[in-house]
């Protein structure tokens, strides 16, 4: 099975797998059952921004979700990622819909990782920015239903030709290059990720959510990981 660390924007509460009974953001360490959650005042039809950061000195993974003109939601969890993730990983975005549906549109995505070692050469860093997405992206690995559209957006889950969200869809997008996320000699390993998103839904209960995730480089969509499992996990354990 894949080794996954994720920040979830969970639009549909699945209380049977430990979700709080409201939309929330959460931090997932190797399981869909979040280690830490915070209530998320999701606003359909508005562009939101997510900022995620990790610092190996503080050993804290944190995420902030905000919409222009309204208060932000923050969640954090103390974890030593050296003990969880392999040394090399890929970073990605995932989303699902189920019986209920929503658009899971990504408008922009950036990521920076840094490995500070005691040596003079501090070359172990990776940075990418997508302010828009090309139609045939060479620098993204698209999995499942994920596509890029003519407006320069990344649609993680299926939409109709008129832009309406489709149910029972799962899609992921990974940056093509593996990331050296930690090494034994590193003094500090840190990363920052930011993405902007737009969720629209005709349903009273949009579903299911979007994640930013980090996984082993050969990660793929697990069988049966749709809906509440957000395209990341094969089961709810």
Curated annotation (Swiss-Prot):
Q: Name one GO biological process term.
A: positive regulation of histamine secretion by mast cell
Name-wise, this protein is: Lectin alpha chain
Q: Which residues bind Ca(2+)?
A: 10, 12, 14, 19, 208
Keyword rRNA-binding carried by entry: no
Keyword flag Repressor: no
GO terms for CC? aleurone grain; plant-type vacuole
Record text on subunit structure and interactions: Equilibrium between homodimer and homotetramer. Oligomerization is pH-dependent with homotetramers forming at pH 6.5 and above.
GO MF annotation list: carbohydrate binding; D-mannose binding; metal ion binding
Q: Which positions bind Mn(2+)? A: 8, 10, 19, 24, 34
